[in-house]
Amino acid sequence: MFIKCCGFQDKDAIETAVLNHVDAIGFITYPKSKRYVSVEEIKSLSKDIPQTIDIVAVVVNLTMVEIDQLIRETSINTLQFHGDESVSFIQEVKEKYPHIKIYKALPANDQLLTNIEAFKNDVDLFLIDTPSKDYGGTGVSYNWSILNALNNIPYLIAGGINIDKIKQIESLNFNHNGYDISSGIETNGQKDKEKIKALLTYVKE
């Protein structure tokens, strides 16, 4: 299973995730998020992460100029579009930066299949998240039954994921590639190294 741990703000937690075989590490560039980090902070936090790991900048409705800066000034190798970005904008980014991997977060709502169909040719990995007017990060799960309709689509399950929920999902036989986890590896809003290690050990062994 592919594991993305998201919302990092300190190097110790990142090091724990890397040592325990995380597949992707996410940084939130959305200023309204409690897990927000600046471009300067991402530059510092990301520089020692191996490039074999997806180093993800989670972006919400950025301009191309802002994306240029992120890619130029940090070690990111993946962009996760988490806003209202159009297919044509993502195509433009992909053409300009063919070496950058593209994730797209989509809400688990009635438009899910339509949205996947629209984006699938330009996206490497989808994240299916809890619907929210505030662009994700709710820490709340949704009704996973909607995922039964997804076949031959690379996607991670997001939205309040923790070890207990992974155990529930394992019995449901979805065709998912893995999980996107943030609040599930935190204690009192801070990344918890023991929770990171426990979750990655459980999934990876």
Residue ranges of model-derived segments:
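Conserved N-terminal beta1-alpha1 strand-loop-helix module at the mouth
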Residues: 1-205
